A protein has these predicted regions:
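Flexible, glycine/threonine- and acidic-rich loop/arm segments that mediate assembly and lattice contacts
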Residues: 1-310
Length: 310
């Protein structure tokens, strides 16, 4: 029976496709606590960035002086120098002239969309380097790498021999480890760990709250606050880049203001650079050169070997 035209016959080729003009990007590239929250220190003026540290042990005995004694002068504590290498990270974008001329499904400019994605990818890589960077001085043909937070913490490190369930006592032990090493005003104030640890902390009881000062909550994710037995209040954040594989699952206890980013002077902060055209394309790169400054890692604590499940 003749019916003119239906969608089931060849006339379907005449119809505009039903293509949603909204693209949901669920890439995990926006959970970047440290890039968003760490302070920015003085600019690095060369590839090796250095700073001085001072630490004097607390008195553990009494050394009284007799009447009329001449003053004796002990050796004074000498400052030590710490350093880190700058690392160059980039996120390049290259589109053929034809592709750059054609709009995206959403109607947006193709080059603009790819540049936005590249910037998010760069920020994600900066975050990963901040947490897990492994120091390398570099050489001809070999890239420099900066030491990340995990690499910097060397004084207060505990590796459990077998998978250990994370308890409230363990959390307080971590905070006390920091308290034992440094002045009370420098005790850790952030716990960064895989999400399974945050879930365990959620069941710890009455010392826990979800309330956070608005100026502290720069990310949209929920940040829990724990009032420890030591007296220190710590933020507990779930972090995607802290080691979470079985056997190496890590909990980082950090004094946040003891870590900063320093960017290479003049050109180190993330920025866009057009690249020379050598063909029928448009190209450029988001690029940065920066390092992590660790003012004194002995205030922070690293523990590994936690159970990877609830």
């Amino acid at each position: 029976m003749a019916f003119g035209k239906q969608t089931y016959d060849g006339s379907g080729k005449e119809m505009r496709e039903s293509l949603l003009s909204i693209l949901k990007d669920v890439s995990p590239n926006e959970d970047n606590y440290f890039v968003s929250n760490l302070g920015v220190g003085s600019a690095a003026t060369q590839k090796t960035h250095e700073w001085n540290l001072y630490f004097a042990d607390r008195a553990t005995s009494v050394d009284p002086e007799i009447e009329g004694a001449e003053t004796s002068y002990p050796d004074l504590t000498v400052e030590t120098r710490s350093s880190n290498s700058t690392v160059i990270l980039d996120a390049p974008v290259k589109l053929s002239r034809t592709r750059a001329s054609i709009a995206m499904v959403s109607g947006e400019d193709a080059m603009g969309v790819e540049k936005e994605r590249a910037l998010k990818a760069l920020k994600s890589e900066m975050e990963y380097a901040t947490v897990n960077g492994s120091y390398a001085a570099g050489s001809s043909g070999v890239a420099r790498q900066m030491a990340g937070i995990d690499y910097c913490i060397t004084t207060n490190v505990t590796a459990w021999g077998s998978a250990r369930s994370f308890t409230e006592t363990d959390l307080n032990d971590i905070i006390q480890t920091s308290w034992d090493k440094v002045g009370a005003s420098y005790v850790i104030d952030v716990i960064a760990a895989p999400v399974v640890i945050k879930r365990r902390v959620a069941g710890f009881g009455t010392n826990l709250t979800r309330n956070v000062q608005a100026e502290d909550k720069k990310l949209t994710q929920e940040v829990r606050v724990y009032d420890s037995e030591v007296g220190q209040t710590v933020k507990v954040i779930a972090h995607k880049d802290v080691l979470k594989t079985a056997g190496t699952l890590t909990v980082l206890g950090l004094r946040e203001d003891h870590f900063e980013h320093s960017f290479l002077v003049n050109t180190g902060e993330p920025h866009w650079e057009d690249r020379a055209k050598s063909g029928d394309f448009e190209a450029g790169v988001y690029i940065t050169e920066f390092t992590l400054v660790s003012y004194d890692e002995r205030a922070s604590v690293k523990t590994t070997g936690w159970l990877s499940g609830l």
